Amino acid sequence: MAKFVFVTGGVVSSIGKGIVAASLGRLLKSRGYRVSILKLDPYLNVDPGTMSPFQHGEVFVTEDGAETDLDLGHYERFTDTAMSRLNSVTTGSVYQSVINKERRGDYNGGTVQVIPHITGEIRERIHRVAANSNADVVITEIGGTVGDIESLPYLEAIREFRGDVGRNDLAYVHVTLLPYIGTSGELKTKPTQHSVKELRSIGIQPDILVCRSDRPIDDELKAKIGGFCGVPTKAVVPSLDADSIYAVPIALEKGGLCRQVLDVLSLQDHESDMASWEALVQKLRNPGPAVKVALVGKYVQLNDAYLSVVEALRHACIHCDSALDLHWICAEQIEENGADGLLKGMDAVVVPGGFGNRGVDGKIAAIRWAREQRVPFLGLCLGMQTAVIEWARNTAGLVGATSAELEPATTHPVIHLLPEQQDVVDLGGTMRLGVYPCRLSPGSKAHELYGEEVVYERHRHRYEFNNAYRNLFLESGYEISGVSPDGRLVELIELKGHPYFLACQYHPEFLSRPGRPHPLFTGLIQAASQRLPQSPSEAISQRA
């Protein structure tokens, strides 16, 4: 039978609950426990699939095609365990389910209320993850901050959860902030005390406190916090600001988080094996020469919009003993100022996914620059589509060529709508989503990188390469190196004779892991590293 851990947050938003939950998952897995993590998001959207990246950040896609919160990406990367649509719960999806049940008559004419019906649905979702994941421990992160009105049904649900399982079968972990006041020269505990007081007023007494701070917490302060908040001093776990999110599990292990959780859950504290993770962090902190990578996007003002892409680049750099020198380039600035001025000196260019017209011409200009300057390039989703448009306009001479998404009346729709998408009306959850197989061409760069003939990748798109232009594409020096098993859909392209020019319709960033980087990103960083000076004299020559 599964045990349950609930992670709440107080004082401020974005305090790092997701990283704490993911880190705890890593620590439990290092002791041999099977783990699943789910996120309860208190917004009324059914899922984040139709939300603006500027408001929500990245949409992370699971194997089974759920569009979810970016925290699920952290869960997967830290635990190296695939999550599913069951691991993402929103207030919108909960209410939708309850209302659908009411319309079907499932409640036998009863009055439908927040308690017990909404809270009961939330509890059922948590139990469903436990039943379907075969996990020893299910960790649930509650979005928002204690005190928010939106989070109240979730907090009530996890309070009620005590009645579903034994007291030794669940633990409450509260993440809080200890702000430092410079004029008094001390960390302040009052916000934490009030946050715990608010949680207690709902009926939840935290078992463990994870205290964020920008400086060390001494034993005296831990004892004070524990005394005021009703937790043992040993259950006050410091969480000092870290130089990398991948260092957080190591810090929380030293602080005793996992041991305290296991103690509350009456589980055995097996020997932890974090050696490979610690080695990874050491490599991250002691990298080799830096590679300059330009990420050319539409949403660069909010870095979280491309979170998995950035993490995939980091994973590849760790593997290649390189430091990542990431340059955020707004595609619209390239439209205004030209590609050369913004991209000159870059060792690699990445064009990630996106939707809509804005910034597309800037992406196309960046791809042309990478092609002509022979700079390693990787295109993802829209990045592949814009690479095809760049080919059509500048190599094939197809005047006005573009995507039917961007200009439905174009005479050369080199990217067009998938046939099965023709009659789709709703935007949410209706794209080509989730894992699909891709057959690679023997002898291609992609086949060399993957080392396999068939790979499985995650998708999120409606538009695809138009096969009416396939022969012309192949005749102009390009190769279609990955297709769907039936050969109908173009999934991966590359340019022959170029140091590294690959673009895929799928999202390889979702499958990259710290200890298992994705081959397409590893190949990009390896190719970028080849551009670095190989000796001091070469470095002087280049600077000159």
Curated annotation (Swiss-Prot):
CDD domains: CTPS_N, GATase1_CTP_Synthase. The keyword Nucleus does not apply. Allosterically activated by GTP, when glutamine is the substrate; GTP has no effect on the reaction when ammonia is the substrate. The allosteric effector GTP functions by stabilizing the protein conformation that binds the tetrahedral intermediate(s) formed during glutamine hydrolysis. Inhibited by the product CTP, via allosteric rather than competitive inhibition. UTP binds at residues 13, 188-193, 224. Gene3D superfamilies: 3.40.50.880, P-loop containing nucleotide triphosphate hydrolases. L-glutamine binds at residues 354, 382-385, 405, 462. It is an enzyme of class 6 (ligase). InterPro entries: Class_I_gatase-like (IPR029062), CTP_synthase (IPR004468), CTP_synthase_N (IPR017456), GATASE (IPR017926), GATase1_CTP_Synthase (IPR033828), P-loop_NTPase (IPR027417). Residues 1-267 are annotated as: Amidoligase domain. Pfam families: CTP_synth_N (PF06418), GATase (PF00117). CTP binds at residues 13, 148-150, 188-193, 224. It catalyses: UTP + L-glutamine + ATP + H2O = CTP + L-glutamate + ADP + phosphate + 2 H(+); L-glutamine + H2O = L-glutamate + NH4(+); UTP + NH4(+) + ATP = CTP + ADP + phosphate + 2 H(+). One of its GO terms (cellular component) is cytosol. The active site is at residues 381, 507, 509. Signal peptide: none annotated. Keywords: ATP-binding, Glutamine amidotransferase, Ligase, Magnesium, Metal-binding, Nucleotide-binding, Pyrimidine biosynthesis. One of its GO terms (biological process) is 'de novo' CTP biosynthetic process. Pathway: Pyrimidine metabolism; CTP biosynthesis via de novo pathway; CTP from UDP: step 2/2. Catalyzes the ATP-dependent amination of UTP to CTP with either L-glutamine or ammonia as the source of nitrogen. Regulates intracellular CTP levels through interactions with the four ribonucleotide triphosphates. CTPSs have evolved a hybrid strategy for distinguishing between UTP and CTP. The overlapping regions of the product feedback inhibitory and substrate sites recognize a common feature in both compounds, the triphosphate moiety. To differentiate isosteric substrate and product pyrimidine rings, an additional pocket far from the expected kinase/ligase catalytic site, specifically recognizes the cytosine and ribose portions of the product inhibitor. PANTHER family: CTP SYNTHASE, CTP SYNTHASE-RELATED. Belongs to the CTP synthase family. Homotetramer. This is CTP synthase.
